[in-house]
Curated annotation (Swiss-Prot):
NCBIfam families: leuD, PRK01641.1. This is 3-isopropylmalate dehydratase small subunit. Heterodimer of LeuC and LeuD. HAMAP family: LeuD_type1. One of its GO terms (cellular component) is 3-isopropylmalate dehydratase complex.
Length: 207
């Protein structure tokens, strides 16, 4: 998993509240257990149109507009990621290329899944998010700098906004660790514990 320290990138605005995981990645794409390849289906129902039996880009959708090509930061509204707990949602966001999502609030399960997949969720107050939407609308191709070690978002005008972050989640993201990799960092301690347990409770082990 790629570590997250500082990212400066184009911001794509998605000005809709309560975007659920079915909107992020529709159910027909959930058959795969591969994390790669889902980016092309991100926001599928909004991103594409059906014309003459063919799927074509919706020119009105933000991800199809040239100003937001290569965006790595998604600006969203409150309760982003609500709905079912499908992990395919952060898989699709990550595969598209998003490193961070900024919003006033996120659904809890979605938020945890994002941490496990290296996506930083930045919670900012509603008035700050409103201001950022205004700035992005006025300046297509608008960029933000997100500094995770400092827990700070910096704008093109040099305004700075601090954001809260769970210490454990911050450690995982900064070092590119999921739960399994975090556990493996304690491999020696686990082996010592298992050896001790083998001596004190041998019936628990089958050689």
């Amino acid at each position: 998993m790629e570590a997250f320290t500082v990212v400066e990138a184009v911001v794509a605005p998605l000005d809709r509240p309560n975007v659920d995981t079915d909107a992020i990645i529709p159910k027909q794409f959930l058959k795969t257990i591969e994390r790669k390849g889902l980016g092309k289906h991100l926001f599928d129902a909004w991103r594409y149109l059906e014309r003459d039996g063919k799927q074509v880009n919706n020119p009105d959708f933000v991800l199809n507009q040239p100003a937001y090509a290569g965006a790595q930061i998604l600006l969203a509204r409150e309760n982003f990621g609500c709905g079912s707990s499908r992990e395919h949602a952060p898989w699709a966001l990550a595969d598209y290329g998003f490193r961070a999502v900024i919003a006033p609030s996120f659904a809890d399960i979605f938020a945890n899944n994002c941490v496990q997949n290296g996506i930083l969720l930045v919670r900012l107050p509603m008035d700050v998010v409103d201001h950022l939407f205004h700035e992005v609308a006025a300046n297509p191709g608008y960029r933000l700098r997100i500094d995770l070690p400092a827990q700070e978002v910096q704008t093109m005008g040099d305004s700075r906004y601090a954001f809260p972050m769970d210490a454990g989640h911050k450690h995982k993201l900064m070092h590119g660790l999921d739960d399994i990799q975090l556990t493996l960092q304690r491999d020696n301690a686990i082996r010592v514990y298992e050896a001790r347990r083998r001596q004190t409770a041998p019936w628990l082990f089958r050689d």
